[in-house]
Swiss-Prot record:
Disulfide bonds: none annotated. The keyword Hydrolase does not apply. GO terms for biological process: DNA replication; DNA-templated transcription; regulation of DNA replication; viral DNA genome replication. It holds the Pfam family PPV_E2_N. It is found in: Host nucleus. The gene is E2. Residues 1-205 are annotated as: Transactivation domain. Residues 330-415 are annotated as: DNA-binding domain. Its main location: host cell. This is Regulatory protein E2. GO terms for cellular component: host cell nucleus.
Length: 415
C-alpha cells in the first residue's frame, strides 16, 4: 500500500462523511452513503495498522482493536439502512441521528427510535427528588427475516417504560423500581408522561388513595381486595396535577431477592387478651409479630420504650458542636462565586495547596428559588479566616481564576 494512495482514499472517505453531515439529509440513500464512507475509513485504518503504520499523512492510526470495533459498527448500521430502503418506512424522513450507533444502542437496545420525550419520576411526593427517563414516540423493532422491521408504540406506566408491537405483550426496557431502591424512602413514586400521571404499582401511592389501605397484599376494605397483578397491569391514569392527600399507611417495599412466604398472615390486629400480647422484654419477638408496613416511618416516630431510653451519666456532657462562626466580635470571610465547575475546582485546589491560608471552607452552594430546588445566581463557596490579616494573605497568595469574583465581609452571630 503506497502512502500517497492510502492518504487519498482516507481523505476521500472523510470528505464524504463531512458532506453527508453538512447536508443534514432526511433520505436513507444519503445515510447509506455516510455509513459506507465510515466503513471504508475504518477498514483502511485497520489495514494500515496491521502493516505497522502509525500515521497516514497527518491522521494518527488507532490500534487494531479500536478500528475493528468501529468497522463492525459501521457495517451493522449500513446493513440496517439498506434493510430500511426495502421496507414500508423507506419514504419516512430519517435523520442521521435517528440512524446513529449511539441511539441504536440506547434503551431499548437493538431498536431504532424516533421522537424522544422526557418521562419524569418523582419519589415520595418530594418535588426535589426526581429522576428523568427517555421515552420514544415510535420504536422500530426487528422481527424475523420474513417480517423484517415493524413499528411499536412506546409508552410509560407506573411500573416503567415499555414498547408494544401489534398484539404482543409489553416489553419493559426501563423499570422504575431499580432506581426507587436507591432514591425512595417509602417505596412510592409518581410518573408524569406528558399530561398523564401514574402511580407506582407496588403499593398505595403517596398522598393518594386514602379511601383504602393495602397491607402485604390485603385491602382494608372488606369488600375490595386486590388480587395478583400481571406485569402488564397499570394504574389508572389521572389528569395532571393529581390531588394530594395524606396517606393512611406507609408501605415498605422489599427487594427482589428477599424471600417471602407463599401463605401470608392476616394483617396485624390488637391482641384480644392480655395473655396474647408480647411484653417489652422481648423486642425481637414483637418486631416479628408486626408486619413491616406498620412499623413507624420517619415522619411518624413512635414514643421511646423504657428499654430504648438512653441513659446518660450524671457527669457526662454533650460534646461541643462545631460552628463556622467561632470568632467573637466578627468573623472575617470571603464569598467566592462563579460557575459550578469553577467553584468546586477552586475549593479542591485551596484544600490541597493552600490549607494554611484560611480557617474553614464550605461546600459549593447556590441560592434556591421560590419553588422546588431551582438555582438562582452563581455557585458560591464561603471561606472563613482567623483574622483580617490572614484574609489579606489569602487574597495575595491564592490566585483567583478568570470568571470568579470574591466578596469580603465580616459575619457576626447575634445569638
Amino acid at each position: 500500500m503506497k502512502m500517497s494512495a492510502a492518504s487519498d482514499h482516507l481523505l476521500a472517505a472523510q470528505e464524504t462523511q463531512m458532506q453527508c453531515i453538512e447536508k443534514d439529509s432526511r433520505l436513507l440513500q444519503d445515510h447509506a452513503c455516510y455509513w459506507g464512507a465510515v466503513r471504508r475509513e475504518k477498514l483502511l485504518l485497520y489495514a494500515a495498522r496491521t502493516k505497522g503504520l502509525k500515521t497516514i499523512g497527518c491522521v494518527p492510526v488507532p490500534p487494531c482493536s479500536v478500528t475493528a470495533e468501529q468497522a463492525k459498527q459501521a457495517i451493522c448500521m449500513q446493513l440496517i439502512v439498506e434493510e430500511l430502503l426495502h421496507s414500508p418506512w423507506a419514504k419516512e424522513p430519517w435523520s442521521l441521528t435517528d440512524l446513529s450507533w449511539e441511539r441504536y444502542q440506547a434503551a431499548p437496545k437493538g431498536c431504532l427510535k424516533k421522537g424522544a420525550r422526557v418521562v419524569e419520576v418523582e419519589y415520595d411526593g418530594n418535588s426535589s427528588n426526581k429522576t428523568w427517563y427517555t421515552a420514544w414516540s415510535t420504536v422500530y423493532v426487528r422481527g424475523t427475516e420474513e417480517e423484517g422491521w415493524e413499528t411499536a408504540v412506546c409508552a410509560a406506566d407506573g411500573q416503567g417504560i415499555y414498547y408494544c408491537a401489534g398484539m404482543s405483550s409489553k416489553v419493559y426496557f426501563e423499570t422504575f423500581e431499580t432506581d426507587a431502591r436507591r432514591w425512595s424512602r417509602t417505596g412510592h413514586w409518581t410518573v408524569r408522561d406528558n399530561d398523564v400521571i401514574y402511580h407506582s404499582t407496588f403499593g398505595a401511592p403517596p398522598h393518594s388513595r386514602n379511601d383504602r389501605d393495602c397491607i402485604e397484599g390485603f385491602w382494608s376494605d372488606a369488600g375490595e381486595r386486590r388480587g395478583s397483578r400481571g406485569s402488564d397491569t397499570t394504574d389508572r391514569a389521572l389528569p395532571y396535577p393529581a390531588a394530594r392527600q395524606s396517606p393512611i399507611c406507609r408501605p415498605v417495599r422489599t427487594g427482589e431477592n428477599r424471600s417471602r412466604a407463599v401463605h401470608r398472615q392476616a394483617p396485624y390486629s390488637a391482641p384480644s387478651s392480655p395473655g396474647s400480647s408480647v411484653g417489652p422484654d422481648s423486642p425481637s419477638e414483637s418486631s416479628r409479630q408486626v408486619p413491616l408496613v406498620l412499623l413507624p416511618g420517619p415522619s411518624d416516630p413512635a414514643p421511646p420504650s423504657p428499654d430504648s431510653t438512653d441513659v446518660i451519666a450524671e457527669g457526662d456532657k454533650e460534646p461541643e458542636r462545631f460552628s463556622i462562626l467561632s470568632k467573637p466580635g466578627g468573623q472575617p470571610c470571603l464569598i467566592l462565586s462563579g460557575n459550578g465547575n469553577q467553584a468546586k475546582c477552586y475549593r479542591f485546589r485551596c484544600k490541597r495547596y493552600f490549607r494554611e491560608h484560611y480557617q474553614h471552607i464550605t461546600t459549593t452552594w447556590w441560592t434556591v428559588g421560590e419553588r422546588g430546588s431551582e438555582r438562582h445566581g452563581d455557585a458560591c463557596v464561603l471561606v472563613t479566616f482567623k483574622d483580617s490579616s490572614q484574609r489579606g494573605v489569602f487574597l495575595k497568595r491564592v490566585p483567583l481564576p478568570p470568571g470568579m469574583r470574591a466578596q469580603a465581609l465580616t459575619m457576626i452571630a447575634d445569638f
